[in-house]
UniProtKB/Swiss-Prot annotation:
Protein name stated in the entry: Large ribosomal subunit protein uL5
Organismal lineage: Bacteria, Bacillati, Actinomycetota, Actinomycetes, Mycobacteriales
Any GO MF annotation of the entry: tRNA binding
Gene: rplE
Gene source species: Mycolicibacterium paratuberculosis (strain ATCC BAA-968 / K-10) (Mycobacterium paratuberculosis)
Cellular component terms per the entry's GO annotation: ribonucleoprotein complex; ribosome
Top-level taxon of the source organism: Bacteria
Length: 187
């Protein structure tokens, strides 16, 4: 009988073997628990048109499930807004929270495959940190991910990606994400 050992994600291995030590030296952390790490990644797709056509939410859910490898949560309107023809409880978006190995694999695919496929991409803005080391950015279309078949896209949908870190300052978060391979613009 053979035992199969679990394969660790490539980016997680690199973080544990190289990045963590360099960040500890860079910031002078006395305790290993003070070293910044990625806590979770939240991928959100807002579909405002779903208020008029409920079938649009299915395409977004399928796209998000293919991209992240996890079934998305359908987000519903919390209150009615007459100007948008929106009623409480109507589906208006889909969200996935990634943690653990799925998170590391998604970040690896994002930095090595998806971001380089964006047309006229010159790097991510380094000013989109929230003050405590978390980074949020948006993608204009879902076709940059290789899991999406371009011929089967019913409509172009953008998404917001929020990378939550355990960093306490923007500089720590920026250093962590740069070490993980995020291509920031040089200002």
């Amino acid at each position: 009988m053979t035992t199969t050992e679990k394969v660790q994600p490539r980016l997680k291995e690199r973080y544990r073997n190289e990045i963590r030590d360099s960040l500890q030296q860079q910031f002078g952390s006395a305790n290993v628990m003070q070293i910044p790490t990625v806590t979770k990644v939240v991928v959100n797709m807002g579909i405002g048109e779903a208020a008029r056509d409920a079938k649009l939410i299915n395409g977004a859910v399928n796209d998000l499930a293919l991209i992240t490898g996890q079934r998305p949560e359908i987000r519903r309107a919390r209150k009615s807004i007459a100007q948008f023809k929106l009623r409480e409880g109507m589906p208006i978006g889909a969200r996935v929270t990634l943690r653990g190995d799925r998170m590391w694999e998604f970040l690896d695919r994002l930095t090595s495959i998806a971001l380089p496929r964006i047309r006229d991409f010159r790097g991510l803005s380094s000013k989109q940190f929230d003050g405590v080391g978390n980074y949020t950015f948006g993608l204009a279309e879902q076709s940059v991910f290789h899991e999406i078949d371009v011929d089967k896209i019913d409509r172009v949908r953008g998404m917001d990606i929020n990378v939550v870190t355990s960093a306490t300052t923007d500089d720590e978060g920026r250093a962590l994400l740069r070490a993980l391979g995020f291509p920031f613009k040089e200002n």
